[in-house]
């Protein structure tokens, strides 16, 4: 989608939350928020060029990925929260999510945890909806196997 007559501020208001959500899903809260800020700063600085791109939000997502990877710490992407702050959930879930590929993790978190549509996720990641479906299917198969979840619970 071209944004030739849209100011950067209008564009950022329309995609800022999506961009941040995708990068947080990929890299965790701290690195994802920082990466989104860097991506938006890059977009603001280069808006004359970025605004003419076919998918500027997808491009800025890639800018954010690069920023997050440069800053990535050696430990896992999810910080270990204090036990008292956690809702009840399967304790093996976080390690199982970390074991997914970045694309699979982003698709699962955005679709199943944040309630996004597959088309919205595809647009943000600059991939086809069928690729999102493939990532979801593979990720869910992996998670079911790791968490020993049966599709047909009695």
Which residues does each PLM region occupy?
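Short amphipathic alpha-helical boundary/capping segments
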Residues: 23-26, 92-100
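Arg/Lys-rich amphipathic alpha helix in sigma70-family domain 2
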Residues: 45-52, 62-81
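DNA-recognition helix of helix-turn-helix
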Residues: 65, 125-154
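A short pre-motif secondary-structure segment
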Residues: 107-111
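A short, charge-rich alpha-helical start-of-domain segment used by transcription regulators
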Residues: 1-21
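C-terminal flanking helix
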Residues: 16, 20, 24, 40, ...
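Conserved RNAP core-binding helix
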Residues: 12, 20, 29-46
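Internal acidic/polar
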Residues: 70, 74-97, 117, 152
């Amino acid at each position: 989608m071209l944004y030739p007559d849209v100011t950067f501020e209008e564009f950022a208001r329309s995609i800022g939350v999506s961009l941040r959500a995708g990068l947080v899903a990929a890299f965790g809260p701290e690195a994802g928020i920082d990466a989104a800020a860097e991506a938006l700063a890059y977009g603001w600085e280069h808006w004359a060029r970025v605004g003419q791109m076919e998918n500027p939000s997808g491009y800025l997502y890639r800018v954010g990925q690069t920023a997050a990877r440069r800053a990535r710490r050696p430990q896992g992407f999810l910080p270990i929260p204090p036990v008292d702050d956690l809702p009840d959930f399967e304790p093996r879930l976080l390690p199982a999510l970390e074991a997914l590929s970045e694309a699979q993790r982003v698709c699962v978190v955005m679709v199943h945890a944040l309630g996004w549509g597959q088309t919205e996720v595809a647009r943000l990641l600059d991939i086809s909806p069928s690729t999102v479906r493939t990532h979801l299917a593979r990720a869910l198969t992996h998670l079911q196997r790791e968490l020993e979840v049966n599709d047909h619970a009695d």
